[in-house]
Amino acid sequence: MANVADTKLYDILGVPPGASENELKKAYRKLAKEYHPDKNPNAGDKFKEISFAYEVLSNPEKRELYDRYGEQGLREGSGGGGGMDDIFSHIFGGGLFGFMGNQSRSRNGRRRGEDMMHPLKVSLEDLYNGKTTKLQLSKNVLCSACSGQGGKSGAVQKCSACRGRGVRIMIRQLAPGMVQQMQSVCSDCNGEGEVINEKDRCKKCEGKKVIKEVKILEVHVDKGMKHGQRITFTGEADQAPGVEPGDIVLFVQEKEHEVFQRDGNDLHMTYKIGLVEALCGFQFTFKHLDARQIVVKYPPGKVIEPGCVRVVRGEGMPQYRNPFEKGDLYIKFDVQFPENNWINPDKLSELEDLLPSRPEVPNVIGETEEVELQEFDSTRGSGGGQRREAYNDSSDEESSSHHGPGVQCAHQ
């Protein structure tokens, strides 16, 4: 069974979420014949449900939205309007104005506007230390000159073309017994449901009822906030007549750092050391995210292997809303070996005397063959394999160029 966020529309058609296009069409035709208003006058609402479900699921883009996000995905992807709002209310129990999980209507019964989403890019330093910054946004506010009416009192009239719904609904017959309900934004009122004569329109907003205004938000980035976390400003989104403003929601986007990588409340870094440091101990200093100079010491006699990881407790990220508790810092060591011929050959024996003894080489009985180790570049692949591939390509080309299908070169 397909993994989907909601199955209501599939249930209406009586098909599983993984149904194919043909299965959807077959189910729709069967139900449309059964509940068509001409055949069953009392099943008008049921027929609308069936038509709506098929319209969504037969459209690949709408179906993907619905499968991934359910009702919420359709609410986001739809422009709203009277007719569509009615069918949403009937099927899902709410209007189109419940954007991003918010209720379609507020407690006082007013419709609720859409939320405004904005990314907020934050450095790792600011997420470690916390920061207060100002963000400038442009939003719609009710026109003060006409109090959001768009014109003088009594000038606003219901659009006769769409009867005040803002959309026009059309039913198109696809085949005998198969129809599709479609809707489009009313061109006469641009989806407003209302019209104002040009001479009566407000001079300031030109009848649009709202004007653009710059809003300065003071944003508090708390210590320990994480990538994807939300900062919400309630009721600060666009204003519209008769609609309660939605929220401005900022999504924290953590910037990449040149030294540290974050994993929850832990930090990771890579530090390069030489062979002598790996064998004889070391000390190094690095600058932390709060500008402290941290000294790391490792005692002589304890060996650091290439790629090994050591941990510094309590030097990770502060916990969100509990900043005195911190994660850990993990340091991965990249041991840099000397270049070839870095030491005088006469000194190699002295160096070998200082290092642990070589393992004993077992005696091999029988014939042996000595081979040479060569440099290998993993990005270029195996040389032998390339030669074989080149040979095969050459043979194929020659075969296709000079002989018929299946004919091979004769051997002398």
From Swiss-Prot:
Cross-link Glycyl lysine isopeptide (Lys-Gly) (interchain with G-Cter in SUMO2) mapped to chain: K134
Sites where the protein binds Zn(2+) 2: C159, C162, C186, C189
N6-acetyllysine PTM sites in chain numbering: K39, K152
Membrane topology: Lipid-anchor
Propeptide: 410-412
Annotated positions of the Phosphoserine modification: S78, S123, S394, S395
Modified residues (Cysteine methyl ester): C409
Keywords: Acetylation, Chaperone, Isopeptide bond, Lipoprotein, Membrane, Metal-binding, Methylation, Phosphoprotein, Prenylation, Repeat, Ubl conjugation, Zinc, Zinc-finger
A Pfam family annotated for this UniProt entry: DnaJ_CXXCXGXG
Location in or out of the cell: Membrane
The name this protein goes by in its record: DnaJ homolog subfamily A member 2
Positions that bind Zn(2+) 1: C143, C146, C202, C205
Gene: Dnaja2
PANTHER family: DNAJ-LIKE-2, ISOFORM A-RELATED
Modification Phosphotyrosine occurs at: Y391
Molecular-function GO term, any one: ATP binding
Purpose of the protein: Co-chaperone of Hsc70. Stimulates ATP hydrolysis and the folding of unfolded proteins mediated by HSPA1A/B (in vitro).
Residues annotated as domain J: 8-70
One GO CC annotation: cytosol
Predominant place of localization: membrane
Organism for this UniProt entry: Rattus norvegicus
InterPro entries with a match to the protein in the record: DnaJ (IPR012724), DnaJ_C (IPR002939), DnaJ_domain (IPR001623), DnaJ_domain_CS (IPR018253), DNJA1/2-like (IPR044713), HSP40/DnaJ_pept-bd (IPR008971), HSP_DnaJ_Cys-rich_dom (IPR001305), HSP_DnaJ_Cys-rich_dom_sf (IPR036410)
CR-type zinc finger segments: 130-214
Gene Ontology biological process terms in this record: carbon tetrachloride metabolic process; protein refolding; response to heat
CXXCXGXG motif repeats: 143-150, 159-166, 186-193, 202-209
